[in-house]
Amino acid sequence: MLFIDNPTVEKVLSMDECIDAQDIAFRGLPTGASVHRPRIDVYVPTDRTDGYFRWGTMEGASKDLGVFAIRMKSDILYWPQDEQGFWKEEKYNTEPGLYCGLVMLFSTRNGAPLAIINDGIIQHMRVGGGAGLGAKYLSRPDSHTVGMIGSGGMARTYLQAFCSVRDIRHVKVYSPTKKNREAYAAEMAGKLEIDVQPVNTPEEAVDGADIVAAATNAMQAALKGAWLQPGQHVTDVRGELDDDVFTRADVIFRQGVAHSRPRNEDVEHMGDGFNNGDYIAGNAEELERLPKRHRSAGVGAAPKAYPSFNDLASGNFPLRTSADQVTLYLNSGNQGLQFAAVGAAVYNRCLELGLGHQLPTEWFLQDIRD
């Protein structure tokens, strides 16, 4: 069994491989070769008077890859507001700047535990890879420009993914903090050898772009449909789109089902917090800590409100049919399967290269029936 840390993941995982692994695994969903359980979060009041503890899990498996994965994360959450009253989610584990997220990989052939993987790099890469899949199938083949709203980790892997599937030459990036967007522009221009310019408004980032991405930690709409122009392809991270985006879009696909929906009788506070169907503990005073999140037309919608990647792979729904259409890819869903596909790619590459920290498999086995 291997323990694989983030520096090792970064060394062995390319964006091209990340996109291809997901594409193959997702195409197993309509045939029954792949399966996943959507994300479930459990919230418990914590000692912070403005925060909550959150435990999150998601699972997925691929018969063809022979792997099952569970991703687990333990966070202390709090939600500061800016001068305009907009919420932003912040989190940590133990102390600010530290995080705890793990992917456990198991063999579906004999059940053996295969690996424990730090989830930091995989998390950003699998989400960026999903956005790349959407751009691969829905953006115009002649797309050369990107309008990026956001300058964090997701904005970095999103741009990597767009460059993997399209000949990207020019990028405009906006985020509220000037030094952050300037740092992003300098870093990504050097890394990808393309022109990246920071701009002063989100509208300026969107104007004239072929691919538009909202890659933020905002809990309200960061991208407005009024800014969109014919022919653009649009994607998101967490539903930070206003309802007009959905009105403007001619073609909409969702990646998959993002969150499980418990029965109402199982969840007293269904719809509070980040997702519909979270399991939330707390008394009336503690529940007041939770933010009131913007919910766009694609957030909290019925799982079958829009065609999914299953439909895309099966050819059941048309993709872009003209250069003037606005296309939208809701980049959430199938998370557990993403971790299985990308985790397997990382694990197999580590075996080939002799990387990772060896752990005795017998530590994780027992002779008492479970």
Regions found by a protein language model. Give the residues of each.
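N-terminal ligand-binding/catalytic initiation module
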Residues: 1-126, 130-132, 142, 337-340, ...
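Adenosine-phosphate binding glycine-rich loop
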Residues: 6-10, 246-370
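NAD(P)-binding Rossmann-fold cofactor-contacting core
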Residues: 165-192
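Short helix-loop-beta connector
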Residues: 139-145, 167, 229-230
